[in-house]
């Protein structure tokens, strides 16, 4: 039982979501894109994710494998985007 608890503590929970701009004029907005998977993947990995891509229908970077506690995941609650 103790080994299971220790294993669960070591395993980091991952989360997926849209990347969020955290500074400047677009703070609180999703990171936008059109077709640039390379940019989204690089930005995702810089923020601790495993894979990022441009979700074409939403025109925003989507990141998989971010730490669950990441402040870089866009949510409606954090949406302070005015545009």
UniProtKB/Swiss-Prot annotation:
Q: Where in the cell is it found?
A: Secreted
Q: Does the entry annotate any disulfide bonds, and if so which pairs?
A: 29-81, 33-54, 40-61, 44-63
Database matches in InterPro entries? LCN-type_CS_alpha_beta_dom, Scorpion_toxin-like, Scorpion_toxin-like_sf, Scorpion_toxinL, Scorpion_toxinL/defensin
Q: Per the UniProt entry, what is one GO biological process?
A: defense response
Signal peptide annotation: 1-15
PROSITE patterns linked to this entry: LCN_CSAB (PS51863)
Q: Which GO terms describe its cellular component?
A: extracellular region
Q: Which Pfam families match?
A: Toxin_3
The LCN-type CS-alpha/beta domain sits at 16-82
- Entry GO MF terms: sodium channel inhibitor activity; toxin activity
Q: In which tissues is it expressed?
A: Expressed by the venom gland.
Q: Which UniProt keywords apply?
A: Disulfide bond, Ion channel impairing toxin, Neurotoxin, Secreted, Signal, Toxin, Voltage-gated sodium channel impairing toxin
Q: Which SMART domains match?
A: Knot1
Similarity comment text for this entry: Belongs to the long (4 C-C) scorpion toxin superfamily. Sodium channel inhibitor family. Beta subfamily.
Domain description from the entry?
Has the structural arrangement of an alpha-helix connected to antiparallel beta-sheets by disulfide bonds (CS-alpha/beta).
Report the protein's function.
Answer: Binds voltage-independently at site-4 of sodium channels (Nav) and shift the voltage of activation toward more negative potentials thereby affecting sodium channel activation and promoting spontaneous and repetitive firing.
Which protein, by its recorded name, is this?
Neurotoxin LmNaTx34.5
What is the species of this protein? Lychas mucronatus (Chinese swimming scorpion)
């Amino acid at each position: 039982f103790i080994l299971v608890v220790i294993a669960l503590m070591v395993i980091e929970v991952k989360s997926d979501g849209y990347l969020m701009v955290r500074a400047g004029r677009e703070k609180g907005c999703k990171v936008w894109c059109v077709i640039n998977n390379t940019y989204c993947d690089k930005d995702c990995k810089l923020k601790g994710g495993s894979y990022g891509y441009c979700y074409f229908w939403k025109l925003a970077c989507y990141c998989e494998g971010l730490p669950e506690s990441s402040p870089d995941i866009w949510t409606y609650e954090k949406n302070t985007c005015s545009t």
